[in-house]
Each structure stands twice: as structure tokens, then as C-alpha cells.
Design a protein with these regions (language model features):
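Short, glycine-biased loop/turn motifs at secondary-structure junctions and
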Residues: 1-166
Length: 166
């Protein structure tokens, strides 16, 4: 098939996903919806990399003892975290990556650096990443400074919007 990709599927310990769909080696599952919108019954969710599946498990699936399968499927929808398919075929179970807490923190900080521009927070982030300052008080100060700046900006915006009658 032309639109066929290697993907990765997380399941619970019993090889089921939310809604009770069973995932078995050699079996193809199909989405029941007609559209292509993520986070709906229109598509089956998967990841392009097993490490992303594990890192996003707490946010997306929340499986306590997940299993991961290499699957083949089409891609009809995607965001920066996952993809959506109309069909997915289970190839085989594979080893679940086990990122350390340091890998998880590093990933979170790198994601933050992609979008957050507060200079105090960015300085703390780079110091944490290069190992020069991983003290808890430095992290707390950076979080406080970043939150304070954002809250002030939000408060100013709220004041302006109300003053303008919006």
C-alpha cells in the first residue's frame, strides 16, 4: 500500500486500548468513524517512535503497565505528538523503552525551550541541561520568575480587555 507506515501502538497489560479494542499480532483493526480528526473515534492513534509513545503515555493513555507493539498503518492525521490511522495491523510486540527520570526531565525542558521565551527560565534550563546548576532552589526560582512574569502579563491583558469593554 502506498500510505503504509511503521508505527507504534501502546496498549494496557491485556493488549487493549481505551474503549476495549483488542490488539493481537497479525490482526488489523479499523477506525469506526468517518472523519480524520485526532482524539475521536474517527481514527486509531499511534506514534512514529516507541520513545514518544512512552513519553506521552501519561498525557494520552495513562496505561499503568503498558505494552508496545510495532504496527503498520496509514496516516490520515497527525500533530506533533501522535498520528491517526484508519487501519492498523499489529506486526509484533517490541521492547518498551524505559527512559530515566533524567531523560524525562531533559525532554520536558527541551520542549519548553522550543516555545517559552522567558529569559530567567531559559537561563535556568540551559544551566540544568549543561549540569552547571541542578539545585532545587534554582528550579524553584526560575519557575517563580516565569510564573510571575506570565501572571503579570495576563493580568495586564485582562485589565486592558475589561477597560476596552470586551
Amino acid at each position: 500500500m502506498k500510505n503504509e507506515h511503521t508505527l507504534y501502538k501502546l496498549t494496557d497489560i491485556n493488549c487493549r486500548t481505551h474503549g476495549g479494542m483488542l490488539w493481537e499480532v497479525g490482526k488489523t483493526n479499523y477506525a469506526t468513524g468517518k472523519g480524520t480528526k485526532l482524539c475521536t473515534a474517527d481514527v486509531l492513534h499511534a506514534y512514529t517512535d516507541p520513545l514518544l509513545a512512552v513519553l506521552f503515555n501519561p498525557l494520552h493513555a495513562g496505561f499503568e503497565n503498558p505494552r508496545i507493539f510495532r504496527i503498520t498503518g496509514d496516516i490520515v492525521a497527525m500533530d506533533n505528538m501522535k498520528v491517526g490511522s484508519k487501519w492498523q495491523r499489529v506486526e509484533y510486540e517490541t521492547d518498551l523503552p524505559k527512559p530515566t527520570i533524567e531523560v524525562r526531565i531533559t525532554f520536558a525542558i527541551l520542549c519548553g525551550l522550543e516555545v517559552y521565551q522567558d529569559s530567567n527560565w531559559r537561563m535556568w534550563a540551559w544551566n540544568w541541561l549543561d549540569g552547571s546548576n541542578r539545585a532545587a532552589d534554582a528550579a524553584a526560582y526560575a519557575a517563580y520568575a516565569a510564573a510571575d512574569v506570565k501572571l503579570i502579563s495576563i493580568a495586564d491583558m485582562a485589565f486592558m480587555l475589561v477597560a476596552d469593554g470586551i
